[in-house]
């Protein structure tokens, strides 16, 4: 390693898929020595990295060993959820500027997230944690009308199912559990209405809303995202309430630093 490289600041980037390529390129443009980790040895982002490690982005202990060896100035990711646990864990171990491990767990576990939001009186739909078929049947009886069935530990709309009738009860359970690493799901009341996504930036505990976008999905039963319209066309009053709710959600999860993406439904009032 030459003197120029030795004098460069190092950043570990978790993920080398096409989603992380812009992050890798930008880090290099900013003068960072990029150390990229991904379990896929053929991940396209490796082409742009200064150094690569073929390691899963959720293998926390293996990544900690990489970080202890490389001694980075920072560790980041983009467009993915679960690696935040690894980032927070390593951040606490090496005293890097990351969210706390407790916050990372709450932000990537939908049940723990709802518990944290509920504790701080942030508006959320009625929900039940389900670990087995018996819990599932009980939860269904406790929520009237349509229900949303979803994994607690998935993202990108994977595993979501809108349950509208009894004939799909088993189908919804199977779809959600198969998309959960620990086969744990949530049963929630369905909030029918338009959805928005809120992009926020938090620094030293102060959150600013960067953008509110109108969310376009495939609709029922899986609600897979197709596109976003930026900025939202909703009126100023609604945007203000959306911003307030997004900031409250960040505070409830104790997010002190970083970017957040919050999905909000506008069934009637209040927002959820």
Task: Please provide the spans of the model-predicted regions.
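Internal nucleotide-binding/catalytic subdomain
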Residues: 160-260
